[in-house]
Amino acid sequence: MKKFTFPITTIFLSVLILVSCKETKNNSVQPSDKTSVLKAGYQIEPVNIQNVKLNDSFWLPIIKRVQEVTIAYAIQKCNEEGRFENFLIAGKQKTGTVRGEMPFDDTDVYKIIEGASNTLISAPNPKLERVLDSLIAIVKIGQEADGYLTTWRTINPAKPPATWVPVIEGKRWESLQISHECYNAGHLIEAAVVHYEATGKRNFLDIAIKNADLFVKTFGDGPGQVKGVPGHQIIETGLIKLYQITGKEDYLKLAKYFLDNRGNPNNHKLYGEYAQDHIPVIQQNEVVGHAVRAVYMYAGMTDIAAMTKDKSYENAVNNLWNNMVNKKMYITGGIGSRHDGEAFGTNYELPNLTAYNETCAAIGDVYWNHRLHSLYGKSQYFDVIERTMYNGLISGISLTGKEFFYPNALEADGVYKSNRGSCTRQAWFDCSCCPTNLIRFIPSIPGLIYSKTNDVLYVNLYASSNSAFKLGKTDLQISQQTSYPWNGKVGISVNPKKEGQFTIKLRVPGWARNEVLPGDLYTYKKASTQRATITINGEAVAVQQQDGYFTINRNWKKGDKIALNFPMEVQEVQTNSKVETNKNKVSLEYGPIVYAVEEIDNKTNFDKINVASGDSFKVKKEVNLLNGVNVIENEKFKAIPYYSWSNRGVGKMKVWLDYKN
């Protein structure tokens, strides 16, 4: 057999091409109105990122950095560490042993393709599309004839890349708890669906369908089928997305089978709390175990609640969400407090120095809350999303796009190595799930801004942008002008093609309603007396908030202008007294941004920094600091946005400050 050498050469060329791939300059909105894949089964659907063009000064530079720097960097790292080579060895186009240290290394390739595909939706780029075609060609080589695709097992089932993966007889599916065969398939499917939406090409989708069809044939209670559930969840949401674009109910049924049989000892030997496999999912009411697995599972459960109208699933996800937000979420939106097991702790167990808060968990939580919003339309889910995105999620990536946090601690002493062996950001990890998950997620952010029904538009997030889509039968163009999150003033231009009546719901952020997060885990020490206001065409409007939204139903016409003002002031946040680590401490916020003090700005007095009753603060824009940020300062200290810490070397940091009456 002739050895396949072209793709590896292509990888090196791909990196060079990508470095030169600047975003296609395109501020106009595509005329098509592509429906989001999340739509089917939900009453509310997100407006697809193809219909939303950002021009803001906060998110757009971050997305561009991922497009122009991080994707190329990750391809280079994956090439160096043998991610691509594994597919070629599995397909017998190269000889060798498995490269890498994790049984899920294949997923780094899939997540890069997914994130890059999302950039193609926002801004078509033929060069980047050719790079993806090369990567997909390599993936295809590693797929077995019947659709199976986990390269380490194909290369040598007797020698997994990690010693903690058990080998019994070397058969497929024999160690589902830890083999990550299902997890690999889940990321493959999710990435393939996004790539298909972005390009209309089936080259990646056909690989995923072939793989999914093998799962449908293999798993179940029928004669000769394998019983069991994934060790690491995500295949459930992948299968449901595949069902949504193909209409093939077998995928939905298998996703539900996996969820229905979690916690079922008659189906398999249970994996325990770590994998949320201790009791049936519909009986679970406390978030436990590995945080990333958990939120991926809860997202799948929410899909099932929406698709099947199963009230037992709906009740379970509501109970789980309430437990997480009320008792186990950090002020930054981070979740999963324990390094041991990368897991949720007990209720109110929220340490700062040793906080884990895996970046992947923050990303998974956004995916889950987005689904909950599509199910219920309540702003509380976007309060969680906004807090997470601006704080404990983008803290995971540096301002250069080439260094990362895997955990996201809320305190650093300059000694404790919280970041997988380092006190500061790292250039890569042996387990590189977080960097590639950031690539996967960040380009999808424009798809979070709006949601809609036939006659209701939800404005969920605020960012300068131009958008065009159909609202029912109405062709609608809408634009935002704002300096959010540094300023709370937002201008919105509404331009329907024809005058008509419909409803616009404008989210009033929780912080602008004196609510840190839903529930009583955090409160502002002193409630703001300032109130959010709204005008339409220059006239003040008295409108009651409904589920956290200003709701305006009227006859809208071209040129209508909405002006929102969410007054910002420095707020001191206190924690529920049941959180022992934060007693007699406060954190500082300005708008949606959580602040931290860093030693580099406070060298002479860092260990003595405190907030006293009656302290005043000023907010100042520093355009040359950390890519341009608002800082909070007074005569005692200077604070920077938490997400931007550790971009200037190793040092101390803290979010929670001693409070003195």
What are these regions (language model features)?
Residues 28-126, 130, 161-198, 233-250, ...:
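Aromatic (Trp/Tyr) and acidic
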Residues 17-20:
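C-terminal motif of bacterial Sec signal peptides marking the signal peptidase cleavage site
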Residues 1-9:
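Bacterial N-terminal signal peptides that target proteins for export
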Residues 127-153, 252-260, 312-328:
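Carboxylate/His-rich catalytic cores and anion/metal-binding grooves
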Residues 22-28:
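Bacterial lipoprotein signal-peptidase II cleavage site
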Residues 317, 383-391, 396-495, 513-536, ...:
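C-terminal beta-rich recognition modules with glycine/proline-rich loops and embedded aromatic residues
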Residues 155-182, 189, 205, 209-230:
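Asp-box/WD-like beta-propeller blade repeats and closely related beta-sheet repeat scaffolds
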